[in-house]
Amino acid sequence: INPGWLENPNPMAEELNKLAKKWDISRPTTGASNQEDPLNGIPDLIAFNRYFGWYGDDCKEMGEWIDKEHRAYPQRCMGISEYGAGADVFQQADSLIHPEPWGQWHPENWQTYYHIENWKQLASRPFLWCKFVWCMFDFSAAGRKEGTTFGRNDKGLVTYDRRIKKDAFY
């Protein structure tokens, strides 16, 4: 691989984008990002991994951020490639309290609230080319220390064993 690409992947991304267009001009190129970067303007389509309402922010900030990006780059075909919140079906709460993402308490009702509120923001913006939930199933994630099972990402809409659909699934 090109030396220095980790420090600045943009030249390699531009090279790959040109190569893809050379092979098939009819297919759009796609990228995913979680930050402001010139890389976001290289592919035909860009999607962002954003977790407003889970990692410290408020769910309503999703729409504000999307609108700001859309105003700044109106020609950019943008979408949301990841949004989600953790949940354990064996943790329930009577009140709605934002859990600590890196903690062990991930009540199911927060995940449901999170998806309802974020979907309101996403559904009201038809210019987004994609709106992907992260993710369908809880999955193994080495080194992760959050939720009730270390080594697991609990953002799925269905439990790890595929047996229980969490409330947010519906």
Please provide the spans of the model-predicted regions.
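Extracellular polysaccharide-recognition and catalytic grooves
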Residues: 34
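Substrate-binding clefts and catalytic carboxylate motifs of secreted carbohydrate-active enzymes
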Residues: 9-30, 38-45, 50-170
